[in-house]
Amino acid sequence: MDLRPGARFCDRCGTKVEKICPACGAVLRDQARFCDLCGVPLEGAAPVSRPKAQKGGIAAGQLHTVAFRADGKVLVTGNNDFGQCDVGGWSDVVGVACGKDFTVAVRADGTALATGNNQFGQCDLSGWTNLIAVACGETHTVGLRSDGTVLATGRDAKAQVGKWENITAVDAGMDHTLGLCKDGTAVAAGQGMFGTCAVEHWQDITAIAAGHMHSLGLRKDGRLLQADGFIAPGVLDWTDLTAVAVGPYHTVAVKQDGTVVASGDIQHGQCQVETWTNVRTVAAGERHTVALCADGRVLAVGDDSAGQCDVTEWKLW
């Protein structure tokens, strides 16, 4: 977000601007001269904005589906063996993400909420602030801060992203993490067992998607790039794309005309999206696919063994 020096509100969207301490990351009064937390002088401190409230959004885990409404409330359906669906008290949510069996959300004040399996500390987000987005891998969580830096927690997560800067989006796969850079390139960290981290040649990227065994980048021209490794048949031939999501074994994308294409494992019907229209974005679970339509309706197809596709009554705005 480009701001005039000393601006208190964004000229474009009206979001209130505050200051962030360059030493400890604390968010401060916009007129503060010293950090209230660590005492560092704040002359030249970078202005940051809170995450802008969205109309709504969706996320898909292994056996559960989550969405947030325009009023900041959260909807959830599916398996709750680890408490991943215990979101009843959540409010002011502006973003959600699902891991295998846990759920994470960003609140309007830039903090995070988490519930579900915490075996590897993937839900230990109590100290996270200044967030604008989150992403979940199978057993780790990644948070994007308003200054373009990235936080991570969970199995083998913290050392992966600590030096990243100028990041505008993040996504997480089974054992790797992707970051979209401001200049349209991408970075990756993690095991890269199947070549999932081979993104150094990517350019002109507008969105990223991390799966179990593959990584995809959506280019400005509406086509996809892949990292080395597994890729679903025909995906690189798709055109006119505006959004992409990947599950462990299937890939889903939205086209400019609001229709949806899918490829990969079809055993549970997760790729039966040919009749969908007016779709804005998609999410891919392990064996199911979810879509958010432009009118606020939510669609789902695939494995419904835990009720993860029971979204017919959902309306996000």
Place the predicted regions along the sequence by residue:
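Cys/His-rich metal-coordination motifs, chiefly Zn-binding "fingers/knuckles"
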Residues: 1-52
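Acidic/polar residues in short coil/turn loops that connect beta-strands
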Residues: 24, 71, 109, 147, ...
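Beta-strand-rich domains and repeat architectures in extracellular enzymes and scaffolds
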Residues: 51-68
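Residue-level recognition of a conserved intra-blade site in WD40 beta-propeller repeats
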Residues: 60, 68, 95-98, 106, ...
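Short glycine/serine- and acidic-residue-enriched loop/turn motifs that recur at repeat junctions
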Residues: 63-64, 68, 75-89, 101, ...
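Conserved core positions of repeat-based scaffolds
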Residues: 64-67, 76, 102-105, 114, ...
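Thr-biased low-complexity repeat/linker tracts and other Thr-enriched repetitive architectures
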Residues: 70-73, 91, 107-113, 129-133, ...
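Repeated scaffold domains used in trafficking and secretory/extracellular systems
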Residues: 93, 131-132, 167-168, 205-206, ...
